[in-house]
From Swiss-Prot:
One of its GO terms (cellular component) is cytosol. It comes from Escherichia coli (strain K12). SUPFAM superfamilies: YrdC/RibB. GO terms for molecular function: double-stranded RNA binding. InterPro entries: DHBP_synth_RibB-like_a/b_dom (IPR017945), Sua5-like_dom (IPR006070), SUA5_domain (IPR052532). This is Uncharacterized protein YciO.
Length: 206
């Protein structure tokens, strides 16, 4: 049976944030709010927790996970960022974007896209997500909470509780969220490529 925390969406209670981070550090899988709906998260190097997430979402081998980072400095530790990419991201983070970048040796090999050695990176603006990452002190392995058979990210924490309370360690209720996905931008080459248009404005990358 999972725990269920009500955390204020604008002013997260630090006591609950610390408890949530402790669950992650001990190998737990959590449901938490982001800019684009709820997500599943775990510690970056915890293979068992990652496999639990794969079972919950019925993900295929080689699924492209995302690393949630608190800021660009942390993002730059886990991915190769040139000057052009850095300027673009600096002007558009935190926010509703996922950036595809080449991963550094800090990223476990099993998380990198097999052929291109890339990884999705995000700097969320959601206050709860930011507070979690600040307290954790490292990126969190993450994927959108899109349950099998659904085309949309889950947005209702009460429904999530009904469906997942026996499969995850913690569900954070951070309000009812939108369902539109992030905009995905590939920054591995000199020219940015819009892979998916979502909530984030694509104009800065065209």
């Amino acid at each position: 049976m999972s725990q269920f925390f009500y955390i204020h969406p604008d002013n997260p209670q630090q006591r609950l944030i610390n408890q949530a981070v402790e669950i992650v550090r001990k190998g737990g899988v959590i449901v938490y709010p982001t800019d684009s709906g709820y997500a599943l998260g775990c510690k970056i190097e915890d293979k068992n927790a990652m496999e639990r997430i794969c079972r919950i979402r019925q993900l295929p081998d080689g699924h492209n996970f995302t690393l949630m980072c608190r800021d660009l400095s942390e993002l730059s530790t886990y991915s190769f960022v040139d000057n052009v990419a850095f300027r673009l991201m600096k002007n558009n983070t935190p926010g509703n974007y996922t950036f595809i970048l080449k991963g550094t040796k800090e990223v476990p090999r099993r998380l990198l896209q097999e052929k291109r050695k890339t990884i999705g990176m995000r700097v969320p603006s959601n206050p709860i997500a930011q507070a979690l990452l600040e307290a954790l002190g490292e990126p969190m392995l993450s994927t959108s909470l899109m349950l099998p058979g659904s085309e949309f990210t889950e947005s209702d924490p009460e429904e999530i509780k009904d469906r997942l309370e026996k499969q995850v360690d913690l569900i954070i209720h951070g309000g009812y969220l939108g369902q539109k996905p992030t905009t995905v931008i590939d920054l591995t080459d000199d020219t940015p490529v819009v892979v998916r248009e979502g909530v984030g404005d694509v104009k800065p990358f065209l």
